[in-house]
Amino acid sequence: MLFRSVGALLCFADCMPVIIVLPTGRFAVVHAGWRGIENEISAKALDLMLDQECQEHDFSRSELAAQTNVYIGPYIHRECFETGADVHALFVTKFGKECRFNETHIDLGAALRVQLIARGIDPARICDLGCCTVCENDRFFSFRAQDGVSGRHGAFAIRL
């Protein structure tokens, strides 16, 4: 069911806020930490929305995907996202070398882009704010940079 004039609020610190907007106005607001990205939560939300739109209307899935916009807010970037060897190997194996920053750090944004592009999202329609919550801790809350005691940001989307 598609509601009119509905809003969604997402609270986050270092995790990735992802807002997916189909050309029809249907949207999803997704909280994606490393486990969510590994389990492709944003891509699954996109799949669900595309499937629903194609069932309800006579749309081509590939055309809808190609016109979908994805907005990514501030999150912990590759320079600051140190992982254990197990998580590092999992991401490189699953999403390719694009998400490998170095021997101990992975690029969550690259892993997400791999998933979205594989589903037909035009790379030019993926808008990443480009801000790291850890590097820019004077502007953003960071669970890691603030030793587990931090505030939260809000990502808000509304369909009018």
Predicted regions and their residues:
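Active-site microenvironment for binding and transforming phosphate-containing groups
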Residues: M1-L160
